[in-house]
Amino acid sequence: PEMMALVRSKGKKVISYNPGWKYDVGEIDMTHLWSYRGKAQPGIPAIDSKFHYLNHFDTFADLVSLYGSRIYNTPQGNDDIAGAILALWHDRLSPTESDMIRNNHLYPNMLAIAERAWLGGGYEYFDGLGTIMPPRGSKDFNAFADFEDRMIWHLSRYCDKNDFVYVKQSVQE
């Protein structure tokens, strides 16, 4: 309670990890769900970052997973689900920031989770197809292919080509 009061006295909001302490509504402002054990509590907005750590899977599979994932396995945000965090959590020492961005496909992955957070939707929560491309010709496959086209168009215009290394997956057999 003392730390929460101190944080609020500085004009800041209180965010706590979950799993962790079980708070009452109004005690904190938001929870950060960082593992599968983390559960949103009704009345307390939650930020989902479970499996949103880059380099958790294969760098190309991350994009498929993030694009197809429902944030907190909900089809749309609501008062209890505030959004998601994507973290660059690389396993290897990278000499430069640019190496971290490129090696973890930050920009493509960032756009995938941003689209999901902005539009809602998705078709699972990492536990069905996970890193596997949806079946060719399916609604989900076609949506991913459309996303790839738009992503490549934007990234080729606004990102340094050295930081945006991507091979279109929806054309691969």
Name every feature range the model reports, one short phrase each.
Residues 1-14:
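Substrate-binding cleft of carbohydrate-active enzyme catalytic domains
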